[in-house]
UniProtKB/Swiss-Prot annotation:
Gene3D superfamilies: 1.20.1270.10, 3.30.420.40, Actin, Chain A, domain 4, Substrate Binding Domain Of DNAk, Chain A, domain 1. Belongs to the heat shock protein 70 family. It comes from the Bacteria. This is Chaperone protein HscA homolog. GO terms for molecular function: ATP binding; ATP hydrolysis activity; ATP-dependent protein folding chaperone; unfolded protein binding. Pfam families: HSP70. Chaperone involved in the maturation of iron-sulfur cluster-containing proteins. Has a low intrinsic ATPase activity which is markedly stimulated by HscB. Transmembrane segments: none annotated. The keyword Chaperone applies. The gene is hscA. HAMAP family: HscA. The keyword Nucleotide-binding applies. GO terms for biological process: iron-sulfur cluster assembly.
């Protein structure tokens, strides 16, 4: 007997009706769009049959814009107005962009760098939107209808500012963002669904301008990212730069005109790609001054040039394994993603590290877009019966806030799966305190000064109470796109303040790696520093409370007792600035001992005052 699926009136979908959603791989070098058609994900081609859209935009006088291959044709002749690898500048400052050495004229602007062109100063968001608009139009032309939304992939290490910039670019392009998805996770979706793989896998993603390594646990219906690492400034472009430096030995490449430098990089990329299948490749460029630079690059020479760059990726892989508490032998397989993984030297060294042949049966240029298409199809509500899986990503660095003494209270630890929400209660430090400053930080160290500041805001309207009586609940929430919001709420009145964290510029992977390394090498000194700060805060609190008590009830002490308390109060006040934790602790203990009897007398006085004039039956 057949089973019928019964829906509520009005909720039953029309036969064959599907919502059109796409997956977009917005890459540094190339971008793609894919969709699920007849239950199979496929990359969509343009009218010429090309699936890869070069991530290049050229701006011309008069307002015309060329995108993709048309833009690349004039790249060497018009480098300042032909923007490539714009993904590197998403959510970055002018200082970051200048440090990249890219051949553009950068303009510092609030929030994000801008690039100077003949059509004015443009942000990376606006440039990326041009690329996304072409992909949206291609998808609508091929699929024959409007899109309900798109899943757009980003490097796993993109921070809040870079992710927000990507969302902004999509909106400018007329796209509804269903979700931002980490590129390695998208690859895991593609391989996991196609092969029903289970176990621990590494996703090695080396694209044109970024590198990501993710360690994933694939089990029945669940994809969980358990550790991530990478470098947002390492990719195929850097291998090209190494070839240029080799071929132009003795030449001051940085002093050459922009057009010459661009031509050299184009020739280097052609040589690198040729060496994938050939033993040697020519490198020939004629500079604008008429000089010819000619060389023949062998695969052995290229492997020698590439070794330090590949070595950096392997060190990131080892670090990610350590973060996950795994050994190399625990990894069942390695998924290769990104066009740069076609280089034989990359596949050989990755295979040697993990002791297994890397998985390359899906096109490394397309695998991310295919996985994004599967996720988009799911989010659009087109999931077929039985296809029910869960996806979990992680945050790369712990999130917390500053407490008294400049200490960090971690709210969400690093490698927590997202989306995630955590809350913790805090209280006031001083009597009558009506406002609280909330300082949100990111990092693994114990002191605020050693962590990265993300945002500050104030909660006002706290009812005046004695210190420690107010209850302020602080909630940290990280959504599925890795964006953070923080809310502080006073429990008795409901007064609330919040902030959405969008840093003015991104945090590089080198900085993340340094922060993680420092948290290990400085663990002992951090523990000592935290202990000292905690004692200093305790001393400050005790000094202030004893001072207030003396002002209110000092008459409860005789002259000798008062002299002892005053002496120890002064000693504790001076101890706050000491760097000796034992000395601070001793001063606090001495003051506590000296005021113990005083505290008891104050309690007695308070009780007598409360009971004065009351009858016994009123207390029953």
């Amino acid at each position: 007997m057949a089973l019928l699926q019964i829906s509520e009136p009005g909720d039953s979908p029309a036969p064959h009706q599907r919502k059109l959603a796409v997956g977009i791989d917005l890459g540094t070098t190339n971008s793609l769009v894919a969709a699920v058609r007849s239950s199979v994900p496929e990359v969509l081609a343009d009218a010429q049959g090309q699936v890869l859209l070069p991530s290049a935009v050229r701006y011309l006088d008069g307002g015309a814009v060329r995108i993709g291959r048309e833009a690349l044709l004039e790249q060497a002749r018009d480098p300042l107005n032909t923007i490539v690898s714009v993904k590197r500048f998403m959510g970055r400052s002018a200082a970051d962009a200048l440090a990249s050495g890219a051949p553009y004229e950068f303009v510092d602007a609030p929030g994000m760098v801008r690039l100077r062109t003949v059509q004015g100063d443009l942000s990376p968001v606006e440039v990326s939107a041009q690329i996304l608009a072409v992909l949206r139009q291609r998808a609508e032309d091929v699929l024959g209808d409007d899109l309900v939304g798109a899943v757009i992939t980003v490097p796993a290490y993109f921070d809040d500012a870079q992710r927000q910039a990507t969302r902004d670019a999509a909106r400018l392009a007329g796209l509804n963002v269903l979700r931002l998805l980490n590129e390695p996770t998208a690859a895991a979706i593609a391989y996991g669904l196609d092969q029903a793989a289970e176990g621990i896998y590494a996703v090695y993603d080396l694209g044109g301008g970024t590198f990501d390594i993710s360690i994933l646990r694939l089990t029945q219906g669940v994809f969980e990212v358990i550790a991530t690492g990478g470098d947002t400034a390492l990719g195929g472009d850097d291998f090209d730069s190494a070839i240029v430096a080799h071929a132009c030995a003795g030449e001051d490449v940085a002093a050459l005109p922009v057009a010459d430098r661009r031509a050299l990089l184009v020739a280097a990329r052609a040589a690198r790609e040729a060496l994938t299948d050939q033993a040697q490749a020519p490198f020939e460029v004629t500079l604008r001054d008429g000089r010819a630079i000619q060389a023949t690059l062998t695969r052995a020479q290229f492997e020698q040039l590439a070794e330090p760059l590949v070595g950096r990726t392997l060190e990131s892989a080892r670090r990610a394994l350590r973060d996950a508490g795994l050994a190399v032998g625990d990894v069942r397989g390695v998924v290769m993603v990104g066009g740069a993984t076609r280089m034989p030297v990359v596949r050989q060294q990755v295979g040697a590290l993990f002791g297994t042949e890397p998985l390359t049966n899906l096109d490394p240029d397309q695998v991310v877009a295919l996985g994004a298409a599967l996720q988009a199809n799911l989010l659009a509500g087109n999931r077929p019966p039985g296809e029910d899986w869960l996806l979990l990503d992680v945050i790369p660095l712990s999130l917390g806030l500053e407490t008294m003494g400049g200490l960090v209270e971690r709210i969400i630890p690093r490698n927590s799966t997202i989306p995630v929400a955590r809350a913790q209660e805090f209280t006031t430090f001083k009597d009558g305190q009506t406002a609280m400053s909330v300082h949100v930080v990111q990092g693994e160290r114990d002191l605020v000064s050693d962590c990265r500041s993300l945002a500050r805001f104030e909660l006002r309207g706290i009812p005046p109470m004695v210190a420690g009586a107010a209850r302020i609940r602080v909630t940290f929430q990280v959504d599925a796109d890795g964006l953070l919001s923080v809310t502080a709420r006073e429990q008795s009145t409901g007064v609330e303040a919040a902030v959405a964290v969008k840093p003015s510029y991104g945090l590089s992977d080198d900085e993340i790696a340094r922060m993680l390394a420092d948290s290990v090498t400085q663990a002992d000194s951090d523990a000592r520093a935290r202990m000292l700060r905690e004692q200093q805060v305790e001393a400050r609190q005790l000094v202030e409370s004893v001072g207030a008590a003396l002002a209110a009830d000092g008459d409860l002490l005789d002259p000798a007792e008062r002299a002892t308390v005053d002496q120890r109060l002064q000693a504790a006040a001076q101890a706050q600035s000491l760097d000796d934790v034992e000395a601070v602790r001793a001063a606090v203990q001495a003051l506590s001992d000296a005021t113990e009897e005083f505290a008891a007398r104050r309690m007695d006085r308070s009780i007598r005052a409360a009971l004065a004039g009351r009858k016994l039956d009123e207390l029953a």
